[in-house]
Amino acid sequence: MRHRKSGRQLNRNSSHRQAMFRNMASSLVSHEIIKTTLPKAKELRRVVEPLITLAKVDSVANRRLAFARTRNIETVAKLFNELGPRFAQRAGGYTRILKCGFRTGDNAPMAYIELVDRPEVAAEEATAE
């Protein structure tokens, strides 16, 4: 029985799930918007939001903890140099999930997940895609 077990399995084993969310978190931090399935977007929010909260206090220990969770130096640098100061006054709710229809082929519900206060230039690039 799976009583009180949180998180979605997404038809993957635990190491695959961990690697997938590591990669998706790095992509979201670098591009500030990504398109994925709705359940993955909802789970990714649980990974990315604590990372941004961690980046609000720039210390060596927090940088090492963020690196342990993402395994990407560029992601850690952007988190602490750009996103931490940008979201310093916001107490959570750093991401937004926008539904965008269904995928051709398997009819999976798709969604954009984006950072809330991203620059408008990036918004124009996303609509061009």
UniProtKB/Swiss-Prot annotation:
Any one GO BP annotation for this protein: translation
Pfam families for the chain: Ribosomal_L17 (PF01196)
InterPro entries for this protein: Ribosomal_bL17 (IPR000456), Ribosomal_bL17_CS (IPR047859), Ribosomal_bL17_sf (IPR036373)
SUPFAM superfamilies: Prokaryotic ribosomal protein L17
Coiled coil regions in record: none
A GO term for molecular function: structural constituent of ribosome
A single Gene Ontology CC term: cytosolic large ribosomal subunit
Highest taxon, organism lineage: Bacteria
Keywords: Ribonucleoprotein, Ribosomal protein
Assembly description: Part of the 50S ribosomal subunit. Contacts protein L32.
Protein family: Belongs to the bacterial ribosomal protein bL17 family.
Protein name as it appears in the record: Large ribosomal subunit protein bL17
Organism: Pasteurella multocida (strain Pm70)
Protein's gene: rplQ
